[in-house]
């Protein structure tokens, strides 16, 4: 791990408490020397363990709880970041919810819950962080995590995929809005495939996942981390949604 200095860049990663893709992104950025703000909603113990792991490896990290669908809590989160770190260079919106449910059983409450976390929270964080970044000479980079399946939906995920389908439009809109305030603020998105296989997946299922891609490889979490770094580092990429599915979309259903 690169030893961070008090002037090193700062990254906020939402939904990074538990061992999901946000957590892996936060750890990867910490390894690159970023000072990390771990966001969680309920996973307090997991978030504190992540902070402890990063700090024991020589990094700098803090954990912050927030319900990101509540505007006041979003404001409070970024006020804490501004107070504790004095800057914000990267925001990765990785917080999300999903739960398979047949169309017959999906309720209005289910749809609302998906939009509340997957759409509204992403919007509120983009706006708050983006306006904060626009006041910095260095600008900043916002990366939204969408889903490659939004154009090739799976059954039983209608509420989830509908909410995730807003991410490309949200990303492009925020890119235009924020660039008009500071051209060094960029907003991009990653649309990954199933990067974290369920623990119970059999080898046959894993092989099926590999065979369903052009590259004949599983969607691995490190590919998302690499893409996050690319979008941070490449200052000429803005308003782009990177499809990260190994070419699966070209092979049909």
Spans of model-derived segments:
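Canonical Rossmann dinucleotide-binding motif of NAD(H)/NADP(H)-dependent dehydrogenases/reductases
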Residues: 3-37
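Catalytic loop of short-chain dehydrogenase/reductase
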Residues: 15, 20, 141-166, 171-180, ...
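Conserved Rossmann-fold SDR core element
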Residues: 87, 178-195, 237-244
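Conserved NAD(P)H cofactor-binding loop of Rossmann-fold oxidoreductase domains
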Residues: 94-100, 247
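Substrate-binding pocket helix/loop in short-chain dehydrogenase/reductase
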Residues: 102-103, 110-112, 209
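A short, exposed helix-loop element centered on a Lys and neighboring polar residues
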Residues: 126-127, 172
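C-terminal substrate-recognition "lid" of short-chain dehydrogenase/reductases
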Residues: 181, 220-244, 249
